[in-house]
Regions:
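Bacterial N-terminal signal peptides that target proteins for export
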Residues: 1-10
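SH3-family beta-barrel domains
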Residues: 21-39, 46-52, 57-117, 121-137, ...
């Protein structure tokens, strides 16, 4: 009986490993300022307006609507027409250092405070991401210091 139980465990773990890519997070950015609602209908209660450029995680997608999570964990509904494929991230650290290269000792390009929105340019090796500030400066940020990846 023990070999069968072991086989079942191995098969279960293998199934999880295969399914893991399906669980990838789907991040979007608001293309323009948009009202968000408590239900997928413009007739439902509007909660607040989210600023253009804000990254969100798309959790559920229905016809014309998406349920999204913001960087604080709030779940709201937004019309799909406001979502763009462009990727932005929000700084999670109190003060994040953006460097000229993807290494701790590289020259400091700029610092960004918590909740600053940065454009995501590309992933970099070693747990870094290349980002650009709205003023045009770009550099590398440690991935754990950003939300929206």
């Amino acid at each position: 009986m023990a070999p069968r139980r072991f086989s079942a465990v191995v098969l279960s773990l293998a199934a999880l490993a295969v399914a893991a890519p399906v669980l990838a997070l789907d991040y979007r950015t608001l293309a323009e300022a948009a009202p968000v609602y408590e239900a997928p209908s413009a007739k439902s209660k509007p909660l607040f307006v989210v600023l253009a450029g804000t990254p969100v995680e798309q959790v559920v997608s229905l016809e014309g609507w998406s349920k999204v999570r913001d960087n604080r964990g709030d779940l709201v509904w937004v019309e799909k027409k406001f979502l763009a494929e462009k990727r932005n991230v929000i700084v999670r650290a109190e003060r994040a250092q953006v460097r000229a290269a993807a290494e701790d000792k590289a020259a400091l390009v700029f610092e960004a405070e918590r909740d600053v929105v940065l454009e995501l340019l590309e992933a970099a090796p070693g747990g870094w991401v290349k980002v650009r500030h709205r003023d045009g400066q770009s550099g590398f940020l440690k991935a754990p210091q950003a939300w929206g990846l």
